Amino acid sequence: MSNNIGKVVQVIGPVVDIKFANDELPNIFNAIHIKMDDGKILVCEVEQHVGDDIVRTIAMEATEGLRRGVEAVDTGAPISVPVGECVLGRIFNVLGKPLDSGAEVNNEEKYPIHRPAPSFEEQSVVPQMFETGIKVIDLLAPYQRGGKIGLFGGAGVGKTVLIQELINNIAKEHGGLSVFTGVGERSREGNDLYYEMMESGVIKNTALVFGQMNEPPGARMRVALTGLTMAEYFRDQGQDVLLFIDNIFRFSQAGSEVSALLGRIPSAVGYQPTLATEMGALQERITSTTHGSITSVQAVYVPADDLTDPAPATTFNHLDAKTVLSRSIAEIGIYPAVDPLDSSSRILDPRVVGEEHYEVASKVKHILERYKELQDIIAILGVDELADEDKLIVARARRIQKFLSQPFTVAEQFTGMQGRYVPIKETIRGFKEILEGKHDNVPESAFLFVGTIEEVLEKARTMAQ
C-alpha cells in the first residue's frame, strides 16, 4: 500500500470527495481505504478528478459515520479480489470478502476487477455451439460457446431451476465451473439459491458473488466485475466457465443512481450518459479466447415491459441468444417452460449447427406456429372440424410440445424423476422421427418428461401393459 494520504472533504451519500497533495492524485479506478471511527475500513473507488486536487470516489459500503477530515489512503491499485480454486463453494461480496461463515480467504493470487478485454489476436473467432443437454434450448435456441444469453422470465416460471441445471450439466458433462453473480438481488433469493445448490451438490463447482438490493449503488455497480474477474481466471486456465448475472438491469440502474451525484447530466429516461460505455466495458470481457471460454447467462428485467427502455435495449445489442420462459407453458405443466417460438439464437444457422439441425428446428417451429394458429378454431369448433392435414399437424405439434419437456437432475427430489442429459445428436434424431410421422401411433402422454425417443417408446410399452 502506498503512503499517499488525503483527507475527506465532502460526503454526499455514496459519493465521497477526497483532497490529496497536488502531485500525488490517485489514478482513476484506484481503491482508497478510509479508516472509520469504529475501526472498520471503508473502501472507495476513484471515479473523477474534479480539480483543486480533489478526487471524487464512490463508496463500496455504507458511508454512515463518515465525516470530513478523516484520513484516506490511496492503495495505488484498483480493487483486487481472490481468484483460483479457493473461491469455489464460497460466497463473496464486491471486495472479495467472504459472506458465508467459512474461513478467511488468504489467497496470494488476486486480480484487479478492472481489466482490458482480450485482444483480437486472443479471441476465438469460430462460432461453436455449446451443448447444454437441455433439448428445447439445444434444438431451437442453441447457446454459443463464449456467447451471451438473455434469460427472460417472471417470478415462479423456473429461472432458478434452469440456472441450477445448467450449472449441474456444465460441471458433470464438460467438467466446467460456474460463477453466479447476484447484482441488486434480493438477499432471500441468494440465500435460497445457496442452500438449494448445497442440496443438489453443485456448490463445489460454483463461486457465488453478491451485491444485494440493500447495498450502496457502488457495490451493485461493481459486483458484476468481481464475478467476471473470477470467471476470467478460470477461462485463462483453459476452462469453459458459465457466468450467471442476475440481474443485468440492476447494473445499469446502480450506474444511473450515482451518475447524477458524480455531476453528469442525465441522458434519455434519466439514465447515465455513459450507459453504453459501461455496458460495453463489461460485455466485451465476456468472450471466448484460444485458451477457454466464458459463456454468460444474464437475467434481464424489462421495466414496465418496455423493450425500448435504454437499459434493456443496450443489453440486447450484446446478446447472442435469448431464452424466454413463459407462464402459459408452465401452466400446462411443461417444464422447462421455455417458449419455443419466442426464444431465438444467432447461431441457429446451417453454417454453424449444420443443415440437419437447422432443417429439423425450422420444421418444429413451423408446426408449433401452425398449431398456435389452429388453437382458436379448435376452441370454437373442436378438433373434428379440422381438415385431415391440420389434424395431423395438431397431433404432431402436441407430441413435439410434450417432447420439449425434460426431467432435471437438480429437481429429482421434487419430481421423483431421474434427470436426463440429452446429447444434441439424440435430440435432433428424436424430433426428426416425430416430424417424419414414425411415432404418430404412440400416445401423447408417453412424450412427457423423458430424455431420448427410446425412452418414449419404452414408456409407451409400459403404459400398454
Swiss-Prot record:
Binding site for ATP: 153-160
Transmembrane segments: none
A single Gene Ontology CC term: plasma membrane
Reactions it catalyzes: ATP + H2O + 4 H(+)(in) = ADP + phosphate + 5 H(+)(out)
Entry's Gene Ontology molecular function annotations: ATP binding; ATP hydrolysis activity; proton-transporting ATP synthase activity, rotational mechanism
Membrane topology: Peripheral membrane protein
Places the protein is found: Cell membrane
SMART domains registered for this protein in UniProt: AAA (SM00382)
Chief location: membrane
Record keywords: ATP synthesis, ATP-binding, Cell membrane, CF(1), Hydrogen ion transport, Ion transport, Membrane, Nucleotide-binding, Translocase, Transport
Keyword Nucleotide-binding listed: yes
EC number: 7.1.2.2
Database matches in InterPro entries: AAA+_ATPase (IPR003593), ATP-synt_VA_C (IPR055190), ATP_synth_F1_bsu (IPR005722), ATPase_a/bsu_AS (IPR020003), ATPase_alpha/beta_chains (IPR050053), ATPase_F1/V1/A1_a/bsu_N (IPR004100), ATPase_F1/V1/A1_a/bsu_N_sf (IPR036121), ATPase_F1/V1/A1_a/bsu_nucl-bd (IPR000194)
Domain of life where this protein originates: Bacteria
Subunit structure: F-type ATPases have 2 components, CF(1) - the catalytic core - and CF(0) - the membrane proton channel. CF(1) has five subunits: alpha(3), beta(3), gamma(1), delta(1), epsilon(1). CF(0) has three main subunits: a(1), b(2) and c(9-12). The alpha and beta chains form an alternating ring which encloses part of the gamma chain. CF(1) is attached to CF(0) by a central stalk formed by the gamma and epsilon chains, while a peripheral stalk is formed by the delta and b chains.
Function: Produces ATP from ADP in the presence of a proton gradient across the membrane. The catalytic sites are hosted primarily by the beta subunits.
UniProt family annotation: Belongs to the ATPase alpha/beta chains family.
Protein name stated in the entry: ATP synthase subunit beta
